[in-house]
């Protein structure tokens, strides 16, 4: 095979076609999105729902989204920062928090659709595979496809923790056990799944084990790294109870009460704006008619003087 040098001449640049902006920025995988959005031609006006999971440095965000010609429509959303109201005040980005966020999203969506009593899901998380579509129900469960964006889908990723939480919450998301923690392949390429290892991740046992290890090996680093846990009186033995209570609280009331809207306060007095630290002058913007009237007054004043 000969080496061909790419000649970037005028013809090259005339025929060059740039990729979509969000693909150039590394934000959207259009190859995957086209397959997640496209609906069968014989299913008229029936949306295709996606379970969108996004991970940031401080939060885990889960949404149920459907695509339209106008744009994407969000039907329900859950954020790991909301777990503070359910008893989880620290560790809002780990695998256990991702599971709680997925569970919160599922229960919130089913409550909104008034299907929470019909599709209860798996009340006690044990790490075993659970498919709500295998149960005998009067109607089909709510189906959504997992949308991971441009995230690398490695085994044990937190994205699949949110997936497991949504499935245990009563949603039908097609999946297998191959990407869950506890799945391994031997030398003969035979896979096996350890549900207990997955359960340990759901209840934060891996964090508790590291807390015990760090407490014995390096107490100063333990106090520094887990200072937020220690301020709340949490240790390695109380983490599992914290997540178990959070699962129970989420199922009791997945919908947070809406805050009343704050009343608007008039902070302007003429050209003065009042703040908590004092006041400052900001002239009121006049209208076009007022500007014209002011110009007329100046013209008439100049005419009278002359």
Curated annotation (Swiss-Prot):
Q: Name one GO molecular function term.
A: 5S rRNA binding
Q: Which Pfam families match?
A: Ribosomal_L18_c (PF14204), Ribosomal_L5e (PF17144)
Q: Which residues form a coiled coil?
A: none
A GO cellular component annotated for this chain's UniProt record is: cytosolic large ribosomal subunit
Q: Which Gene Ontology BP annotations are present?
A: ribosomal large subunit assembly; translation
Query: Where is this chain's protein located in or outside the cell?
Result: Cytoplasm; Nucleus
Q: Which UniProt keywords apply?
A: Cytoplasm, Nucleus, Ribonucleoprotein, Ribosomal protein, RNA-binding, rRNA-binding
**Subunit record text:** Component of the large ribosomal subunit (LSU).
The cross-references to PANTHER family, in alphabetical order and at most eight, read: LARGE RIBOSOMAL SUBUNIT PROTEIN UL18, RIBOSOMAL PROTEIN L5-RELATED
Q: Which family does it belong to?
A: Belongs to the universal ribosomal protein uL18 family.
Please give the function described in this protein's UniProt entry: Component of the ribosome, a large ribonucleoprotein complex responsible for the synthesis of proteins in the cell. The small ribosomal subunit (SSU) binds messenger RNAs (mRNAs) and translates the encoded message by selecting cognate aminoacyl-transfer RNA (tRNA) molecules. The large subunit (LSU) contains the ribosomal catalytic site termed the peptidyl transferase center (PTC), which catalyzes the formation of peptide bonds, thereby polymerizing the amino acids delivered by tRNAs into a polypeptide chain.
Annotated protein name in UniProt: Large ribosomal subunit protein uL18
State the species of origin. Theileria parva
């Amino acid at each position: 095979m000969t080496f061909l040098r790419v000649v970037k001449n005028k013809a090259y640049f005339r025929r060059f076609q740039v990729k979509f902006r969000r693909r150039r920025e590394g934000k959207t995988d259009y190859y995957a999105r086209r397959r997640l959005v496209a609906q069968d031609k014989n299913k008229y006006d029936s949306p295709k729902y996606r379970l969108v999971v996004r991970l940031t440095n401080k939060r885990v965000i889960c949404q149920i989204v459907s695509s339209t010609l106008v744009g994407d429509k969000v039907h329900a959303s859950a954020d790991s920062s909301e777990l503070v109201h359910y008893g989880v005040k620290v560790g809002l980005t780990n695998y256990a928090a991702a599971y709680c966020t997925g569970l919160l999203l599922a229960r919130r969506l089913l409550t909104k659709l008034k299907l929470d009593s019909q599709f209860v899901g798996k009340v006690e998380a044990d790490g075993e595979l659970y498919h709500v579509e295998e149960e005998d129900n009067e109607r089909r469960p709510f189906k959504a496809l997992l949308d991971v964006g441009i995230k690398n889908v490695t085994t044990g990723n937190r994205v699949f923790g949110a997936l497991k939480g949504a499935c245990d919450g009563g949603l039908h998301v097609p999946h297998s056990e191959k990407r869950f923690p506890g799945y391994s392949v031997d030398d003969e390429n035979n896979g096996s799944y350890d549900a207990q290892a997955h359960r340990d991740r759901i209840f934060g046992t891996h964090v508790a084990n590291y807390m015990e290890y760090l407490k014995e090996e390096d107490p100063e680093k333990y106090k520094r790294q887990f200072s937020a846990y220690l301020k709340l009186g949490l240790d390695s033995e109380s983490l599992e109870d914290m997540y178990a209570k959070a699962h129970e609280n989420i199922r009791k009331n997945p919908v947070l009460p809406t805050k009343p809207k704050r009343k608007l306060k008039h902070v302007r007095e003429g050209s003065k704006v009042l703040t908590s630290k004092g006041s400052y002058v900001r002239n009121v913007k006049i209208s076009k008619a007022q500007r014209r009237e002011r110009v007329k007054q100046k013209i008439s004043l100049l005419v009278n003087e002359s």
